Amino acid sequence: KDIIEEIVNLVHEAEERFDSEIYIVSDEPYRKIIFDDLEYPNVFELHNRYIVATSHSKDLALPGERIGYIAVHPNIDDKTELIDALIFCNRSLGFVNAPALMQHVVESLQSVTVDVGEYQKKRDFLYPKLIKMGYKVVKPNGAFYMFPRSPIKDDVKFTEELLNHKVLVVPGTGFGLPGYFRLSYCLEDSILEGSLSGFEAAISKYSDN
């Protein structure tokens, strides 16, 4: 919440400086996948001109499904104009819509989510193992990704080294984080356990660098 409040404060300062209304658009597909008893803040309490876009592909474990919604503050100005613009974008840009049945039931899905505890257990299994091997990584508070620092500057080269050990990760360069790599731990426990030897072998090769 502190980070979001900092962003909102910056927006409020900019609105005063430029005498203009500024909208915050937040993409929040992981808002329900939070660990350690943390809670996601109600962003609409912080800023009237807040637009939230979210997808149930993550919190319902339906990868690839186009099921979600866009929510705006109830006191936002020009709601009709905004809705018209969203409908226009959806029609003209060729997005794939959710099946009609899912569009009707999506409202009833708001209190439903995957077992977040399962993701947290996987995080709690993998994180200390990577730290012990020598990887530098921030412990995530949600979702199901980690961004360890590559032990060498060339993150692409290191991901190729991991691939040689049958561990598939993605270079951080593709996410604007050169020098890091992204791994996903929403996998079977046996796969996570099987990856440990590969992570160990890869970092051992560059441990003196």
Annotate each PLM feature.
Residues 1-209:
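PLP-dependent class I/II
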